[in-house]
Amino acid sequence: MAIEVSVLRVFTDSDGNFGNPLGVINASKVEHRDRQQLAAQSGYSETIFVDLPSPGSTTAHATIHTPRTEIPFAGHPTVGASWWLRERGTPINTLQVPAGIVQVSYHGDLTAISARSEWAPEFAIHDLDSLDALAAADPADFPDDIAHYLWTWTDRSAGSLRARMFAANLGVTEDEATGAAAIRITDYLSRDLTITQGKGSLIHTTWSPEGWVRVAGRVVSDGVAQLD
């Protein structure tokens, strides 16, 4: 039986360009044992399997898979799934993932999630001194035993930076927009940020000294795909 995959792009710019592709699948249609194979088949950096909220509930449950493995938390899948649920007419306040309970909110065309900084995977953070150095970085030059987050300021006073992320350890050579890495860099710098990542994806973060980081972005739909 063919499985329907809603294809989204998460963290687009204000014109709906760029963004990180995401597959969203109704978890009731797929046995847990089959999810990893489907995530690998889909080819997205992450695929999220969502258990829809019960009638009258504002909580959903989800699991997240890269092409290689299941992970307890990721940013762009939780933002994307939260947007997808609102589009279906079932907006939520919380999304339960293996790492914990993600807080969800909606602000105009922005969908936001709040998560603990320690839920995000560990990244090797590389502070670079110029946009040229960032652009010249080659994923092949970085060890594949950990994800690498490269960044440089574009406007330090405004909290604006440019970033790239390499995650060969998760089966992703370069990720276009990484919510979990945005959480880590926000916690690392202890300030609100506007992050342009990859080709032009846009992520907004809000830092809290209590260990929570809010990640917000725009989402667009690229239609529906079928997996056999």
From Swiss-Prot:
Record-level Gene Ontology MF annotations: isomerase activity
Pfam families: PhzC-PhzF
Signal peptide: none
Top-level lineage group: Bacteria
PANTHER family registered for this protein in UniProt: ANTISENSE-ENHANCING SEQUENCE 1, PHENAZINE BIOSYNTHESIS PROTEIN
UniProt-recorded name of the protein: Uncharacterized protein Rv2716
SUPFAM superfamilies the UniProt entry points to: Diaminopimelate epimerase-like (SSF54506)
GO cellular component terms listed in the entry, alphabetical order: cytoplasm
Organism field: Mycobacterium tuberculosis (strain ATCC 25618 / H37Rv)
GO biological process, one term: biosynthetic process
